[in-house]
Curated annotation (Swiss-Prot):
It is found in: Cytoplasm. Manganese or magnesium. Binds 1 divalent metal ion per monomer in the absence of substrate. May bind a second metal ion after substrate binding. Endonuclease that specifically degrades the RNA of RNA-DNA hybrids. Residues 16-207 form the RNase H type-2 domain. SUPFAM superfamilies: Ribonuclease H-like. PROSITE patterns: RNASE_H_2. GO terms for molecular function: manganese ion binding; RNA binding; RNA-DNA hybrid ribonuclease activity. This is Ribonuclease HII. A divalent metal cation binds at residues 22-23, 115. Belongs to the RNase HII family.
Length: 234
């Protein structure tokens, strides 16, 4: 988890500071879901070029990432790994990440705006769910960029551990290339076993393993000797 809190540039106490919250990586078959919360001082100049992270090029996201972390009064980035996703389910894992992200900036923010139509339970401050918020609210746009860049960087690091899957290119999404690699190599520890394509692959692996074991037993010397004894008895 990454966080920052700028104590030296807090505005006056009567300024309504709002945290923008968004996630990246709910849909991929591998890797974490990442949630970010960002708080800006509304009295300061805006960062030019903010937008929904999905509408920006990787280079543009990286450039804006640097501006956001430099200018934010506070930000928090939370990573929920694939094991937690499989344990909780992706929805609950995302809600957990959102709650932790808001908690990370609650000492600054008086409220939060969260992209989507659902709010996590037990938030430390009042919150509003904003459908399409990553295209409507600048703090949510900033949060979407922090979450996306953080996750993309992490997937590039995972590629170094698991080079067979191409995580550096598709970032864990179920592209044809990823599905082909999954079929050839099977899932790794970073794959989400609760997601249908991965679960199906694990089922196929288990079937093949049982078939191989059965075939091995049928051809083993012990099995052959046992069959000979049966034939003699006949």
């Amino acid at each position: 988890m990454v966080s920052q809190f700028d104590t030296q540039h807090l505005p006056s106490s009567n300024t309504a500071l709002v945290a923008g919250v968004d996630e990246a990586g709910r849909g991929p078959l591998a890797g974490p879901v990442v949630v970010a919360a960002v708080v800006f001082d509304p009295s300061q100049p805006r960062i030019n070029g903010l937008n929904d992270s999905k509408q920006l090029s990787p280079a543009c996201r990286e450039r804006l990432y640097a501006h956001i972390v430099e200018r934010a009064l506070a930000y928090k980035v939370v990573m929920i790994d694939s094991t937690q996703i499989d344990t909780l389910n992706i929805y609950q894992a995302t809600m957990l990440g959102m709650r932790l992200a808001v908690e990370g900036v609650a000492h600054v923010a008086k409220s939060a705006r969260i992209d989507g139509n659902r709010l996590p339970k037990n938030l430390p401050c009042p919150a509003e769910a904003l459908v399409g918020g990553d295209a409507r609210d600048r703090t949510i746009m900033a949060a979407s960029i922090l979450a996306k860049v953080t996750r993309d960087r992490h997937m590039v690091e995972l590629h170094l551990q698991y080079p067979h899957y191409g995580f550096d290119k598709h970032k864990g999404y179920g592209t044809p290339a990823h599905l082909a690699a999954l079929a050839e190599h099977g899932p790794c520890l970073e794959h989400r076993r609760s997601f249908a394509p991965v679960r199906k692959m694990l089922t196929l692996e288990a079937i093949h393993a049982r078939q191989s074991t059965h075939q091995h037993n049928e051809n083993s010397p012990t099995k052959a000797a046992f069959n000979m004894l049966l034939e003699r008895d006949d």
